[in-house]
């Protein structure tokens, strides 16, 4: 096969991302690489019945901002995002 016959490797325009909760509940989303993750974050929040502001989303230990895209984060098909519930109040122990 000549070099002219080889097609360049073009990544697919969509990828599947798994969002995993602290309770090990997984929700899968198919998203475009160049669309802000805000859409997926909002859809996840709606699916679990919480406001988006109640969650922190992380990938490989790095917090994800809603305006970032999969391309900016180098996300690949099958990658996992962790969804953590923000703690609203602390605990105070008084004697």
Swiss-Prot record:
Residues 13-90 form the Ubiquitin-like domain. Stress conditions rapidly and substantially elevates the amount of SUMO1 and SUMO2 conjugates with a concomitant reduction in the amount of free SUMO proteins. The SUMO conjugation system plays an important function in stress protection and/or repair. Keywords: Cytoplasm, Isopeptide bond, Nucleus, Ubl conjugation pathway. PANTHER family: SMALL UBIQUITIN-RELATED MODIFIER (PTHR10562). It comes from Arabidopsis thaliana. Its main location: nucleus. The keyword Transmembrane does not apply. One of its GO terms (cellular component) is cytoplasm. It comes from the Eukaryota. Pfam families: Rad60-SLD. There is a cross-link at residue 90 (Glycyl lysine isopeptide (Gly-Lys) (interchain with K-? in acceptor proteins)). This is Putative small ubiquitin-related modifier 7. Ubiquitin-like protein which can be covalently attached to target lysines as a monomer. Does not seem to be involved in protein degradation and may function as an antagonist of ubiquitin in the degradation process. Belongs to the ubiquitin family. SUMO subfamily. The gene is SUMO7. Interacts with SAE2, SCE1, SIZ1 and MMS21 Covalently attached to a number of proteins. It is found in: Nucleus; Cytoplasm.
């Amino acid at each position: 096969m000549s070099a002219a016959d080889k097609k360049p490797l073009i990544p697919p325009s969509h990828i599947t991302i798994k969002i995993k909760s602290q309770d090990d509940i997984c929700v899968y989303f198919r998203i475009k690489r160049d669309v802000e993750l805000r859409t997926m974050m909002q859809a996840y929040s709606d699916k679990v019945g919480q406001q988006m502001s109640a969650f922190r989303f992380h990938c490989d230990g790095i917090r994800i901002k809603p305006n970032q895209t999969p391309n900016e984060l180098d996300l690949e098909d099958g990658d996992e995002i962790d969804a953590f519930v923000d703690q609203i109040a602390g605990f105070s122990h008084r004697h």
